[in-house]
UniProtKB/Swiss-Prot annotation:
It is a multi-pass membrane protein. The chain crosses the membrane at residues 34-54, 118-138. GO terms for cellular component: membrane. Residues 1-33, 139-163 are cytoplasmic. Keywords: Membrane, Transmembrane, Transmembrane helix. Partially overlaps YOL100W. This is Putative uncharacterized membrane protein YOL099C. Coiled coil: none annotated. It comes from Saccharomyces cerevisiae (strain ATCC 204508 / S288c). Residues 55-117 are extracellular. It is found in: Membrane.
Length: 163
């Protein structure tokens, strides 16, 4: 990613507080079903199904962050052509594509990767299917900056150590 140097620093420890500010206005795709947490939190609003609310606790944040960080690490280990990052109106959109074989590599390394046929909608969507690639669309701009900052730190460590 050639434009990582443009991203401003963001304190990772403030992420949870910032996320909670965005939750009331977060509107995922109506066709996406929330499968994370208590099923009772999968609600339809005004009969439109345009919003999905869930119980978001620190345990959920840790679990999701672990999966995300492992997948980002896997993206750095495999073919870099699978990684696309671009900027739209100041917001970062990252799409990472992985094939089924790439997932097996990650699992063999002990990464906490999701099982096949899992669909989650939290702060981002990711689709994992045995016959397609994984598609990640990160929705919150604060989340995008945090993720990219993690990559900046990771890449700078690699560069400093000539890895």
């Amino acid at each position: 990613m050639k434009t990582l140097d443009k991203i401003t620093n963001y304190d990772l420890f403030d992420f949870a507080d910032e996320f909670l500010k965005f939750v009331p206005v977060f509107r995922p795709n109506p066709t996406v079903t929330c499968l994370f947490g208590n099923p009772l939190t999968n609600l339809l609003v005004n009969g439109t199904g345009a919003a999905c609310f869930f119980e978001f606790c620190s345990l959920a944040l840790i679990k999701v962050s672990k999966i995300l960080l492992d997948l980002l690490l896997l993206a750095l280990l495999i073919d870099s052509e699978n990684e696309l990052c671009f900027e739209i109106d100041g917001d970062w959109l990252c799409v990472l594509g992985f094939g089924e074989g790439d997932l097996e590599v990650g699992r063999s390394l002990g990464m906490a990767l999701p099982d096949d046929d899992v669909l989650l909608s939290i702060t981002f969507w990711f689709l994992c299917n045995s016959s397609f690639s994984i598609l990640f669309v990160f929705e919150l701009r604060i989340f995008l900056r945090t993720v990219n900052n993690l990559l900046v730190v990771f890449l700078s460590v690699l560069k400093r150590n000539d890895l």
